[in-house]
Amino acid sequence: MSERLPVLLQYLVPQRALTVFAGFVASGRWGGITTAIIRRFVRKYRVDMSEAAEPDIARYTRFNDFFTRALRPGARPLASAELVCPVDGAISQFGAIERDQIFQAKGHHYSTRALVGGDAELAARFQDGQFATLYLSPRDYHRIHMPCDGRLLRMIHVPGDLFSVNPVTARGVPGLFARNERVVCEFDGPLGPFVLVLVGATIVGSMATVWHGQVNPPRSGRLREWRYADRELRLRQGEEMGRFLLGSTVVALFPQGSVRFDPGWEPGRAVRLGEAMAFAPLL
């Protein structure tokens, strides 16, 4: 019962109205009020500001500027691995995709096709492949970086719900990551095609990518797609590719037989940007 009540409340709260209001507050310049909000947030979630490029809270004029703060140079060195962790956060789940089914939590799976917005051809590339679901808590650094070199092929904005994506909700809401609003980014990399899915959540005001800027809002209620195959848009391993304006989850997809996850990985473990995530398969 302890977990059922907060999940039930997720169905009752006006998710979109709450998210729009949070976005309005976070993007506004409210002077001393903004500073007070940030200061309280830092205390509540024990945010380590010594890692930030700008550690002085008073220098942030908007909450969003604080939330998407850059790290100081050298704060996240890259491991020597084919795939490095793209975010600071925690491992929600990872492992094999069983045919087209991705494990969310005990008793809950969702399909790769649903996750990528219904594109059967794209989903088929990851049948029996590998996935990693990474949760970013409020205290974490909220920029997303490239796990490896990649050439951008396509971006899809998939409209959806705005449930919270914390571990309790992941255990209680069926198909959570395939029903929330999300941005699907398709790349070609050294180990083959891969996808990074930025999943929205309650009070996630917007998601942005470095090549497009803010993707949402607007929220048109329909699927939107951008193609980049003819633009030779390439990003290097460790380079920023996007950010959450208020936190969420990233789901990464890799083809069958293309990666071996680091043996130290396990669900619930804290991870940091740049640490080893996976390696090329053994020959």
Curated annotation (Swiss-Prot):
A GO term for molecular function: phosphatidylserine decarboxylase activity
Reactions the enzyme catalyzes: a 1,2-diacyl-sn-glycero-3-phospho-L-serine + H(+) = a 1,2-diacyl-sn-glycero-3-phosphoethanolamine + CO2
Site entry: Cleavage (non-hydrolytic): G247, S248
A Gene Ontology term for the protein's cellular component: plasma membrane
InterPro entries linked to this entry: PS_Dcarbxylase, PSD-B, PSD_type1_pro
Subunit-level organization: Heterodimer of a large membrane-associated beta subunit and a small pyruvoyl-containing alpha subunit.
Family: Belongs to the phosphatidylserine decarboxylase family. PSD-B subfamily. Prokaryotic type I sub-subfamily.
Name used for this protein in its record: Phosphatidylserine decarboxylase proenzyme
Organism: Methylibium petroleiphilum (strain ATCC BAA-1232 / LMG 22953 / PM1)
Gene: psd
